[in-house]
Protein backbone atom coordinates (compact mmCIF):
# COMPACT_ATOMS: atom_id res chain seq x y z
CA UNK A 1 0.00 0.00 0.00
CA UNK A 2 1.37 3.39 -1.01
CA UNK A 3 1.54 5.95 1.81
CA UNK A 4 2.27 9.50 0.59
CA UNK A 5 3.72 10.51 3.96
CA UNK A 6 6.32 7.72 3.80
CA UNK A 7 7.24 8.75 0.26
CA UNK A 8 7.66 12.36 1.44
CA UNK A 9 9.68 11.19 4.45
CA UNK A 10 12.20 9.48 2.17
CA UNK A 11 12.89 12.71 0.29
CA UNK A 12 12.91 14.72 3.53
CA UNK A 13 15.63 12.41 4.83
CA UNK A 14 17.63 12.56 1.59
CA UNK A 15 16.92 8.99 0.50
CA UNK A 16 16.44 8.07 -3.18
CA UNK A 17 12.96 7.78 -4.69
CA UNK A 18 12.14 5.04 -7.18
CA UNK A 19 10.06 5.33 -10.35
CA UNK A 20 7.12 3.30 -8.97
CA UNK A 21 6.85 5.51 -5.90
CA UNK A 22 7.00 8.66 -8.01
CA UNK A 23 4.28 7.32 -10.32
CA UNK A 24 2.04 6.45 -7.35
CA UNK A 25 2.53 9.87 -5.78
CA UNK A 26 1.67 11.69 -9.01
CA UNK A 27 -1.39 9.47 -9.54
CA UNK A 28 -2.51 10.58 -6.09
CA UNK A 29 -1.94 14.21 -7.03
CA UNK A 30 -4.13 13.71 -10.10
CA UNK A 31 -7.00 11.85 -8.42
CA UNK A 32 -6.94 14.00 -5.27
CA UNK A 33 -5.95 11.27 -2.82
CA UNK A 34 -2.70 13.15 -2.14
CA UNK A 35 -3.64 16.29 -0.23
CA UNK A 36 -2.54 19.85 -0.93
CA UNK A 37 -0.48 19.76 2.27
CA UNK A 38 1.31 16.63 1.12
CA UNK A 39 2.12 18.17 -2.28
CA UNK A 40 3.47 21.25 -0.47
CA UNK A 41 5.58 19.10 1.86
CA UNK A 42 6.99 17.14 -1.07
CA UNK A 43 7.80 20.34 -2.96
CA UNK A 44 9.64 21.76 0.05
CA UNK A 45 11.55 18.49 0.59
CA UNK A 46 12.63 18.62 -3.07
CA UNK A 47 13.57 22.29 -2.74
CA UNK A 48 15.99 21.48 0.09
CA UNK A 49 17.20 17.99 -0.89
CA UNK A 50 16.84 18.17 -4.69
CA UNK A 51 16.18 15.30 -7.10
CA UNK A 52 18.76 13.22 -8.94
CA UNK A 53 18.56 13.08 -12.74
CA UNK A 54 16.84 9.68 -12.54
CA UNK A 55 14.31 11.08 -10.05
CA UNK A 56 13.69 14.09 -12.29
CA UNK A 57 13.05 11.78 -15.24
CA UNK A 58 10.65 9.71 -13.12
CA UNK A 59 8.72 12.80 -11.96
CA UNK A 60 8.57 14.17 -15.50
CA UNK A 61 7.26 10.92 -16.99
CA UNK A 62 4.72 10.51 -14.18
CA UNK A 63 3.41 14.04 -14.78
CA UNK A 64 3.31 13.37 -18.53
CA UNK A 65 1.26 10.23 -17.96
CA UNK A 66 -1.22 11.98 -15.63
CA UNK A 67 -3.34 12.92 -18.67
CA UNK A 68 -3.54 12.54 -22.43
CA UNK A 69 -0.35 11.89 -24.40
CA UNK A 70 -0.63 12.85 -28.05
CA UNK A 71 0.50 10.28 -30.61
CA UNK A 72 1.15 11.60 -34.12
CA UNK A 73 2.20 8.30 -35.71
CA UNK A 74 -1.30 7.40 -36.91
CA UNK A 75 -1.44 10.59 -39.00
CA UNK A 76 1.46 9.44 -41.17
CA UNK A 77 3.22 12.80 -41.03
CA UNK A 78 6.08 13.13 -43.48
CA UNK A 79 8.52 14.69 -41.06
CA UNK A 80 9.65 14.99 -37.42
CA UNK A 81 7.41 16.37 -34.65
CA UNK A 82 9.56 19.08 -33.07
CA UNK A 83 9.13 22.20 -30.95
CA UNK A 84 10.87 25.05 -29.16
CA UNK A 85 10.20 26.26 -25.63
CA UNK A 86 11.37 29.51 -24.06
CA UNK A 87 11.73 30.28 -20.38
CA UNK A 88 10.14 33.63 -21.24
CA UNK A 89 11.04 37.27 -21.26
CA UNK A 90 10.11 40.61 -22.76
CA UNK A 91 9.46 41.07 -26.49
CA UNK A 92 10.03 37.34 -27.08
CA UNK A 93 7.92 36.81 -30.19
CA UNK A 94 10.16 34.08 -31.64
CA UNK A 95 7.50 31.32 -31.59
CA UNK A 96 5.29 33.15 -34.08
CA UNK A 97 8.06 33.11 -36.69
CA UNK A 98 9.88 29.90 -35.75
CA UNK A 99 6.82 27.62 -36.00
CA UNK A 100 5.94 28.61 -39.59
CA UNK A 101 9.62 28.70 -40.64
CA UNK A 102 10.26 25.16 -39.38
CA UNK A 103 6.98 23.94 -40.92
CA UNK A 104 8.03 25.41 -44.28
CA UNK A 105 11.23 23.32 -44.03
CA UNK A 106 9.39 20.03 -43.47
CA UNK A 107 8.92 19.91 -39.69
CA UNK A 108 5.65 19.50 -37.79
CA UNK A 109 5.29 21.87 -34.85
CA UNK A 110 2.46 21.19 -32.33
CA UNK A 111 3.30 24.13 -30.08
CA UNK A 112 1.44 24.18 -26.77
CA UNK A 113 2.06 27.59 -25.22
CA UNK A 114 1.18 29.52 -22.11
CA UNK A 115 -0.16 32.89 -21.08
CA UNK A 116 2.05 35.56 -19.57
CA UNK A 117 2.41 35.88 -15.81
CA UNK A 118 4.55 38.40 -13.97
CA UNK A 119 6.78 40.52 -16.20
CA UNK A 120 7.01 37.99 -19.05
CA UNK A 121 4.74 37.99 -22.08
CA UNK A 122 2.88 34.84 -23.12
CA UNK A 123 2.57 33.50 -26.66
CA UNK A 124 -1.14 32.78 -26.14
CA UNK A 125 -1.78 36.42 -25.20
CA UNK A 126 -0.07 37.55 -28.39
CA UNK A 127 -2.24 35.22 -30.49
CA UNK A 128 -5.33 36.47 -28.64
CA UNK A 129 -4.67 39.82 -30.33
CA UNK A 130 -5.67 38.18 -33.64
CA UNK A 131 -9.49 38.46 -33.99
CA UNK A 132 -11.18 35.06 -34.17
CA UNK A 133 -8.02 33.00 -33.51
CA UNK A 134 -9.01 30.06 -31.31
CA UNK A 135 -6.21 29.44 -28.82
CA UNK A 136 -8.11 26.51 -27.26
CA UNK A 137 -9.39 24.38 -30.17
CA UNK A 138 -10.51 20.80 -29.65
CA UNK A 139 -7.96 18.04 -30.16
CA UNK A 140 -9.28 17.14 -33.62
CA UNK A 141 -8.87 20.73 -34.89
CA UNK A 142 -5.39 20.90 -33.36
CA UNK A 143 -4.29 17.64 -34.99
CA UNK A 144 -5.86 18.59 -38.32
CA UNK A 145 -4.06 21.95 -38.37
CA UNK A 146 -0.70 20.34 -37.55
CA UNK A 147 -1.23 17.73 -40.28
CA UNK A 148 -2.40 20.17 -42.99
CA UNK A 149 -0.38 23.31 -42.17
CA UNK A 150 2.62 21.88 -40.33
CA UNK A 151 2.22 24.17 -37.32
CA UNK A 152 -0.43 25.01 -34.73
CA UNK A 153 0.13 27.19 -31.68
CA UNK A 154 -2.49 26.65 -28.99
CA UNK A 155 -2.98 26.63 -25.21
CA UNK A 156 -2.63 23.75 -22.76
CA UNK A 157 -5.85 21.79 -22.42
CA UNK A 158 -7.04 20.48 -19.07
CA UNK A 159 -6.18 16.95 -20.17
CA UNK A 160 -2.48 17.55 -20.85
CA UNK A 161 -0.32 16.92 -17.76
CA UNK A 162 -3.07 17.82 -15.25
CA UNK A 163 -0.86 16.78 -12.31
CA UNK A 164 1.61 19.50 -13.26
CA UNK A 165 -1.12 22.12 -13.14
CA UNK A 166 -2.04 21.17 -9.56
CA UNK A 167 1.58 20.88 -8.41
CA UNK A 168 2.49 24.24 -9.94
CA UNK A 169 -0.45 26.02 -8.29
CA UNK A 170 0.71 24.72 -4.89
CA UNK A 171 4.39 25.55 -5.56
CA UNK A 172 3.31 29.07 -6.49
CA UNK A 173 1.96 29.77 -2.98
CA UNK A 174 4.54 27.80 -0.95
CA UNK A 175 7.82 29.50 -2.00
CA UNK A 176 9.00 26.47 -4.00
CA UNK A 177 8.72 27.82 -7.56
CA UNK A 178 12.53 28.20 -7.81
CA UNK A 179 13.31 24.47 -7.61
CA UNK A 180 15.22 23.64 -10.82
CA UNK A 181 14.17 19.98 -10.54
CA UNK A 182 10.48 20.86 -10.43
CA UNK A 183 10.75 23.57 -13.11
CA UNK A 184 12.34 20.92 -15.33
CA UNK A 185 9.54 18.41 -14.74
CA UNK A 186 6.88 21.08 -15.26
CA UNK A 187 8.25 22.18 -18.64
CA UNK A 188 9.12 18.75 -19.99
CA UNK A 189 5.99 16.88 -18.86
CA UNK A 190 3.88 19.15 -21.07
CA UNK A 191 6.28 18.86 -24.01
CA UNK A 192 6.43 15.06 -23.71
CA UNK A 193 2.61 14.96 -23.51
CA UNK A 194 2.57 16.78 -26.85
CA UNK A 195 4.25 13.74 -28.41
CA UNK A 196 7.46 15.44 -29.53
CA UNK A 197 10.41 13.73 -31.18
CA UNK A 198 12.71 16.64 -30.39
CA UNK A 199 12.84 19.88 -28.39
CA UNK A 200 15.09 22.92 -28.38
CA UNK A 201 15.02 25.03 -25.20
CA UNK A 202 15.62 28.78 -25.27
CA UNK A 203 16.88 29.57 -21.76
CA UNK A 204 17.08 33.30 -21.11
CA UNK A 205 19.91 35.05 -19.26
CA UNK A 206 19.85 38.60 -17.90
CA UNK A 207 17.73 41.26 -16.19
CA UNK A 208 14.50 40.13 -17.86
CA UNK A 209 15.08 36.39 -17.46
CA UNK A 210 13.02 34.01 -15.33
CA UNK A 211 16.11 32.66 -13.57
CA UNK A 212 17.89 35.20 -11.33
CA UNK A 213 21.50 34.57 -12.42
CA UNK A 214 23.43 33.31 -15.44
CA UNK A 215 24.59 30.35 -13.33
CA UNK A 216 21.00 29.37 -12.50
CA UNK A 217 19.99 29.72 -16.17
CA UNK A 218 22.82 27.37 -17.17
CA UNK A 219 21.83 24.93 -14.41
CA UNK A 220 18.24 24.86 -15.69
CA UNK A 221 19.38 24.39 -19.30
CA UNK A 222 21.61 21.45 -18.34
CA UNK A 223 18.82 19.87 -16.27
CA UNK A 224 16.31 20.14 -19.13
CA UNK A 225 18.77 18.66 -21.64
CA UNK A 226 19.67 15.74 -19.35
CA UNK A 227 16.08 14.96 -18.33
CA UNK A 228 14.60 15.45 -21.81
CA UNK A 229 17.10 13.04 -23.32
CA UNK A 230 16.67 10.69 -20.36
CA UNK A 231 12.93 10.62 -21.07
CA UNK A 232 13.53 9.64 -24.70
CA UNK A 233 13.11 13.03 -26.39
CA UNK A 234 16.11 14.51 -28.22
CA UNK A 235 16.73 17.78 -26.37
CA UNK A 236 19.22 20.63 -26.66
CA UNK A 237 19.28 24.14 -25.18
CA UNK A 238 20.65 27.54 -26.17
CA UNK A 239 21.34 30.28 -23.62
CA UNK A 240 20.18 33.62 -25.09
CA UNK A 241 20.26 37.20 -23.87
CA UNK A 242 17.37 38.88 -22.05
CA UNK A 243 19.10 42.01 -20.73
CA UNK A 244 16.79 44.03 -22.99
CA UNK A 245 13.59 43.43 -24.93
CA UNK A 246 14.29 40.87 -27.67
CA UNK A 247 12.03 42.57 -30.20
CA UNK A 248 12.05 46.39 -30.33
CA UNK A 249 8.49 46.24 -28.98
CA UNK A 250 6.62 44.60 -26.10
CA UNK A 251 2.86 44.15 -25.99
CA UNK A 252 0.52 41.71 -27.66
CA UNK A 253 -0.82 43.33 -30.85
CA UNK A 254 2.49 45.17 -31.30
CA UNK A 255 4.43 41.90 -31.20
CA UNK A 256 2.07 40.20 -33.67
CA UNK A 257 2.66 43.14 -36.04
CA UNK A 258 6.41 42.69 -35.50
CA UNK A 259 6.15 38.97 -36.34
CA UNK A 260 4.20 39.75 -39.52
CA UNK A 261 6.79 42.35 -40.55
CA UNK A 262 9.51 39.74 -39.96
CA UNK A 263 7.82 36.97 -41.95
CA UNK A 264 6.93 39.27 -44.87
CA UNK A 265 10.43 40.81 -44.95
CA UNK A 266 9.33 44.33 -44.07
CA UNK A 267 11.60 44.41 -41.00
CA UNK A 268 13.91 41.85 -39.38
CA UNK A 269 15.56 43.39 -36.29
CA UNK A 270 19.08 41.97 -35.91
CA UNK A 271 18.84 40.55 -32.36
CA UNK A 272 15.43 39.01 -32.97
CA UNK A 273 16.69 37.52 -36.25
CA UNK A 274 19.80 36.05 -34.59
CA UNK A 275 17.80 34.24 -31.90
CA UNK A 276 15.05 33.09 -34.27
CA UNK A 277 17.52 31.68 -36.78
CA UNK A 278 19.69 29.99 -34.12
CA UNK A 279 16.74 28.20 -32.50
CA UNK A 280 15.07 27.32 -35.81
CA UNK A 281 18.35 25.97 -37.24
CA UNK A 282 18.95 23.83 -34.16
CA UNK A 283 15.42 22.42 -34.52
CA UNK A 284 16.05 21.44 -38.15
CA UNK A 285 19.28 19.69 -37.16
CA UNK A 286 17.56 18.02 -34.18
CA UNK A 287 14.78 16.77 -36.44
CA UNK A 288 17.15 15.48 -39.12
CA UNK A 289 15.93 18.06 -41.63
CA UNK A 290 19.38 19.60 -42.11
CA UNK A 291 22.96 18.27 -42.07
CA UNK A 292 24.32 21.06 -39.89
CA UNK A 293 23.59 24.62 -38.75
CA UNK A 294 24.83 26.18 -42.01
CA UNK A 295 22.58 23.94 -44.12
CA UNK A 296 19.66 24.66 -41.78
CA UNK A 297 20.14 28.44 -42.03
CA UNK A 298 20.21 28.16 -45.81
CA UNK A 299 16.87 26.32 -45.81
CA UNK A 300 15.33 28.77 -43.33
CA UNK A 301 16.45 31.81 -45.30
CA UNK A 302 14.91 30.27 -48.42
CA UNK A 303 11.64 29.71 -46.51
CA UNK A 304 11.63 33.41 -45.57
CA UNK A 305 12.72 34.77 -48.95
CA UNK A 306 10.24 32.65 -50.93
CA UNK A 307 7.31 33.63 -48.73
CA UNK A 308 6.75 29.98 -47.73
CA UNK A 309 7.10 30.73 -43.99
CA UNK A 310 4.68 33.68 -44.20
CA UNK A 311 2.22 31.48 -46.07
CA UNK A 312 2.34 28.83 -43.30
CA UNK A 313 1.60 31.51 -40.69
CA UNK A 314 -1.35 32.80 -42.74
CA UNK A 315 -2.74 29.27 -43.18
CA UNK A 316 -2.40 28.54 -39.45
CA UNK A 317 -4.31 31.74 -38.60
CA UNK A 318 -7.15 30.84 -41.00
CA UNK A 319 -7.27 27.19 -39.84
CA UNK A 320 -7.75 28.37 -36.25
CA UNK A 321 -10.44 30.95 -37.03
CA UNK A 322 -8.48 34.14 -37.75
CA UNK A 323 -8.81 36.55 -40.71
CA UNK A 324 -7.58 35.45 -44.15
CA UNK A 325 -6.09 38.87 -44.94
CA UNK A 326 -4.12 39.37 -41.71
CA UNK A 327 -0.74 39.45 -43.46
CA UNK A 328 -1.98 41.80 -46.17
CA UNK A 329 -3.80 44.20 -43.84
CA UNK A 330 -2.61 43.77 -40.23
CA UNK A 331 -3.67 47.32 -39.29
CA UNK A 332 -7.27 46.41 -40.16
CA UNK A 333 -7.33 43.62 -37.58
CA UNK A 334 -4.83 44.41 -34.82
CA UNK A 335 -6.06 46.73 -32.07
CA UNK A 336 -4.42 50.15 -31.81
CA UNK A 337 -4.07 51.93 -28.46
CA UNK A 338 -5.95 55.19 -27.89
CA UNK A 339 -2.83 57.06 -26.72
CA UNK A 340 0.65 56.75 -28.29
CA UNK A 341 3.37 58.99 -26.86
CA UNK A 342 7.17 59.18 -27.13
CA UNK A 343 9.38 58.90 -24.04
CA UNK A 344 12.09 61.57 -24.51
CA UNK A 345 15.55 60.84 -23.11
CA UNK A 346 16.34 63.17 -20.18
CA UNK A 347 19.96 63.56 -21.37
CA UNK A 348 22.29 62.58 -24.20
CA UNK A 349 24.36 59.41 -23.97
CA UNK A 350 24.83 55.79 -24.92
CA UNK A 351 22.44 53.18 -23.52
CA UNK A 352 24.56 51.25 -21.00
CA UNK A 353 21.96 49.16 -19.24
CA UNK A 354 18.25 48.38 -19.42
CA UNK A 355 16.13 47.04 -16.56
CA UNK A 356 14.33 44.59 -18.81
CA UNK A 357 12.10 43.31 -16.02
CA UNK A 358 10.93 46.89 -15.36
CA UNK A 359 9.93 47.23 -19.03
CA UNK A 360 7.91 44.02 -18.79
CA UNK A 361 6.20 45.23 -15.62
CA UNK A 362 5.42 48.54 -17.35
CA UNK A 363 3.51 46.59 -20.02
CA UNK A 364 1.64 44.71 -17.27
CA UNK A 365 0.77 48.02 -15.55
CA UNK A 366 -0.60 49.33 -18.86
CA UNK A 367 -2.97 46.35 -18.90
CA UNK A 368 -1.00 44.26 -21.39
CA UNK A 369 -0.17 41.49 -18.91
CA UNK A 370 -1.57 39.97 -15.75
CA UNK A 371 -0.62 39.78 -12.10
CA UNK A 372 -3.25 37.08 -11.43
CA UNK A 373 -4.14 34.20 -13.74
CA UNK A 374 -7.75 35.40 -14.04
CA UNK A 375 -6.89 38.99 -15.08
CA UNK A 376 -8.15 40.21 -18.48
CA UNK A 377 -5.64 41.92 -20.75
CA UNK A 378 -5.71 44.83 -23.20
CA UNK A 379 -4.00 43.55 -26.36
CA UNK A 380 -3.50 47.06 -27.81
CA UNK A 381 -1.14 48.46 -25.17
CA UNK A 382 2.63 48.17 -24.88
CA UNK A 383 5.96 49.71 -25.84
CA UNK A 384 7.54 50.18 -29.26
CA UNK A 385 10.72 51.45 -30.96
CA UNK A 386 12.72 50.68 -27.80
CA UNK A 387 16.32 51.91 -27.78
CA UNK A 388 18.94 49.16 -27.57
CA UNK A 389 22.04 48.78 -25.39
CA UNK A 390 24.98 50.41 -27.16
CA UNK A 391 22.74 52.86 -29.06
CA UNK A 392 23.49 56.59 -28.80
CA UNK A 393 20.51 58.78 -27.89
CA UNK A 394 20.44 62.58 -27.92
CA UNK A 395 18.56 64.50 -25.24
CA UNK A 396 14.89 64.69 -26.20
CA UNK A 397 15.06 61.79 -28.63
CA UNK A 398 12.71 58.92 -27.76
CA UNK A 399 13.88 55.98 -25.67
CA UNK A 400 10.72 54.36 -27.01
CA UNK A 401 7.00 54.92 -27.41
CA UNK A 402 4.21 54.06 -24.98
CA UNK A 403 0.89 52.70 -26.30
CA UNK A 404 -1.74 53.19 -23.59
CA UNK A 405 -5.49 53.32 -23.02
CA UNK A 406 -5.32 56.81 -21.46
CA UNK A 407 -2.93 59.68 -20.70
CA UNK A 408 -2.49 58.78 -17.03
CA UNK A 409 -1.41 55.21 -17.82
CA UNK A 410 0.92 56.52 -20.54
CA UNK A 411 2.59 58.94 -18.11
CA UNK A 412 3.11 56.19 -15.54
CA UNK A 413 4.68 53.85 -18.13
CA UNK A 414 6.87 56.64 -19.53
CA UNK A 415 8.26 57.24 -16.06
CA UNK A 416 9.02 53.52 -15.68
CA UNK A 417 10.89 53.49 -19.00
CA UNK A 418 12.98 56.53 -18.07
CA UNK A 419 13.94 54.85 -14.80
CA UNK A 420 14.67 51.58 -16.62
CA UNK A 421 17.31 53.07 -18.95
CA UNK A 422 20.83 53.97 -17.81
CA UNK A 423 22.78 56.27 -20.17
CA UNK A 424 26.52 56.93 -20.04
CA UNK A 425 29.50 57.92 -22.14
CA UNK A 426 30.02 54.42 -23.54
CA UNK A 427 28.04 51.23 -23.74
CA UNK A 428 28.53 47.86 -25.36
CA UNK A 429 25.73 45.57 -26.50
CA UNK A 430 25.80 42.15 -24.80
CA UNK A 431 26.04 39.06 -27.01
CA UNK A 432 22.67 37.83 -28.25
CA UNK A 433 23.62 34.15 -28.08
CA UNK A 434 25.75 32.80 -25.22
CA UNK A 435 26.24 29.06 -25.67
CA UNK A 436 24.59 25.81 -26.57
CA UNK A 437 24.13 22.91 -24.16
CA UNK A 438 23.60 19.38 -25.45
UniProtKB/Swiss-Prot annotation:
It holds the Pfam family Glycos_transf_3. Homodimer. The enzymes which catalyze the reversible phosphorolysis of pyrimidine nucleosides are involved in the degradation of these compounds and in their utilization as carbon and energy sources, or in the rescue of pyrimidine bases for nucleotide synthesis. It comes from Burkholderia orbicola (strain MC0-3). Belongs to the thymidine/pyrimidine-nucleoside phosphorylase family. The lineage of its organism: Bacteria, Pseudomonadati, Pseudomonadota, Betaproteobacteria, Burkholderiales. It catalyses: thymidine + phosphate = 2-deoxy-alpha-D-ribose 1-phosphate + thymine. GO terms for cellular component: cytosol. GO terms for biological process: pyrimidine nucleobase metabolic process; thymidine metabolic process. Its EC number is 2.4.2.4. This is Thymidine phosphorylase. NCBIfam families: PRK05820.1 (NF004490), T_phosphoryl (TIGR02643), Y_phosphoryl (TIGR02644). The keyword Transferase applies. SUPFAM superfamilies: Nucleoside phosphorylase/phosphoribosyltransferase catalytic domain, Nucleoside phosphorylase/phosphoribosyltransferase N-terminal domain, Pyrimidine nucleoside phosphorylase C-terminal domain. Pathway: Pyrimidine metabolism; dTMP biosynthesis via salvage pathway; dTMP from thymine: step 1/2. Disulfide bonds: none annotated. The keyword Glycosyltransferase applies. GO terms for molecular function: 1,4-alpha-oligoglucan phosphorylase activity; thymidine phosphorylase activity. Keywords: Glycosyltransferase, Transferase.
Amino acid sequence: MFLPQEFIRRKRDGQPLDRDGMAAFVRGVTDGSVTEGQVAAFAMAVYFNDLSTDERVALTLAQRDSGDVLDWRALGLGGPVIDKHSTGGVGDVVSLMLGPMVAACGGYVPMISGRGLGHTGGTLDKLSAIPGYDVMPDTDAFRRTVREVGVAIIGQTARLAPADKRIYAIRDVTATVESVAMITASILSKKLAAGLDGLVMDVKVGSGAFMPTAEKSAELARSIVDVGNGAGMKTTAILTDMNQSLAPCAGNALEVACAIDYLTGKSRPARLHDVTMALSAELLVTGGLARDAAHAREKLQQALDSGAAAERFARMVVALGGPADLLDAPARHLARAAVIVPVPAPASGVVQRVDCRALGLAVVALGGGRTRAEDAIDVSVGLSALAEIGQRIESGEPLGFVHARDEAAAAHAADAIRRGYVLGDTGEAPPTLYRQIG
